[in-house]
Amino acid sequence: KIQMDKLKNTMTMSVGVNYKGVGRMVYPGIIQILSFLSMNPQTHQKAFHDQILREINGEASEVDRHNTFYDEYLAVMDMTAEFYLSTVDRIFKNREIALNKFSIDNKKIDIENIQNTAVFIIEGANDDISAPGQCLAAVKLLKKLPKNKKISHLQKNAGHYGIFSGKAWRNEIKPKFLKFLDNNNYDC
């Protein structure tokens, strides 16, 4: 297991002199996107190789599928170091939500007592970041929430990014999500 001080020293840095927020400690967005790209390097390499060939052959455009996808996928921003480190420490290492020990501003959030809302869980069958079943397991902590207020959807052939982007989102997930909002009287 990586220690938090090592994570702080290797994954955060201060904002440079020529930028707003100079000196502020952040988890740079570029580290996050490089981490995502490194998980499937062959896929991304092939996508850019094929796009270069389309450019050479005059078959590419600014709004083609490749450019549209990567314009969004590569749009990242820095996170405050405090938020990043706190999330890693509290949620992933110490499992505060899973153990029902989560608090905000020193006020304990009793997850088992949540009852006046509805929850829609969306997971991707091919998610290589948050394995399918993690969100569903967390919903079991909502013991006072009626079953009809707990909805889950496992999207076939979708990964971590794909559940909120592209065809799977537009054609399958979004319609179910909008129906969920309507059924639970949520105004958007």
Language-model-detected regions and their locations in the chain:
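Alpha/beta-hydrolase-fold enzymes
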Residues: 1-82
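Short acidic (Asp/Glu) and glycine-rich catalytic loops that position anionic groups and cofactors
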Residues: 63-69, 117-118, 155-158
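Active-site nucleophile elbow and catalytic-triad environment of alpha/beta-hydrolase enzymes
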Residues: 93-111
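Short, conserved loop/helix-junction motifs that constitute active-site signature segments
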Residues: 111-116, 142-147
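Short beta-strand/loop motif that positions the catalytic acidic residue
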Residues: 114-115, 120-123, 127
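Conserved alpha/beta-hydrolase "acid-adjacent" motif
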Residues: 128-137
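Catalytic histidine-centered segment of alpha/beta-hydrolase-like enzymes
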Residues: 129, 153-172
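C-terminal alpha-helix
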Residues: 176-187
